[in-house]
Amino acid sequence: FRYADFDGDSRIASYFNWLDPNVVKSLLSNELRAELPSINPLEHSLSEIADEIPPLNKMLYLEQKHYLADHNLNYTDKMSMAMGIEVRVPLLDPDLVELSARLPIKFKQNNREGKWIFKKAMEGILPNDVIYRPKTGFGVPMRNWIQGPLKKLVREILSETSINNRKWFDHKAVSQLIAQDQAGKIDGSYSIFQLLCIELWARIFIDEDII
């Protein structure tokens, strides 16, 4: 309900916020905070397309341009190539993507049933209990990791000295986030994990430190 009073493109863009933008902003150093753009990058992407496009198609546009490209395809490619496996994505054939983009809304979502035309096309080919079973995510036990086996690493990598030397984040805000998460007051596990990954990335590719 945090974004319930947002209008138009602001509301559509808010559905794709992995983390609360205000929380992200609070974690940044004063120098980086001052350089933040005044407009949400997702809203900027929506400004590139026509206003009369239906909200569902706007959401699919953001899904394809940002979430799919930067998240799903990215980690699928990295993980598969790390194992020496070539993963193909036939549903991203350019002709099929263009055809799907032109389809009327009623073929994409029928009442609360998403991927409607795709599911109808598979009837008679796959069992209906496979086609229409509820979607299941592939989440990881992030909170258990952060509060368990990664707890010591988090304290070492995101120490006050480390944060101050990097000058990207506010060490007081980061320390408070970690403390509140460990105390069970909030679930800050994904924020902490992203901070951890950023610092490790910086050590490897900027500092050229062999970890």
Model-predicted segments: where are they?
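Adenosyl-5′-phosphate
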Residues: 2-211
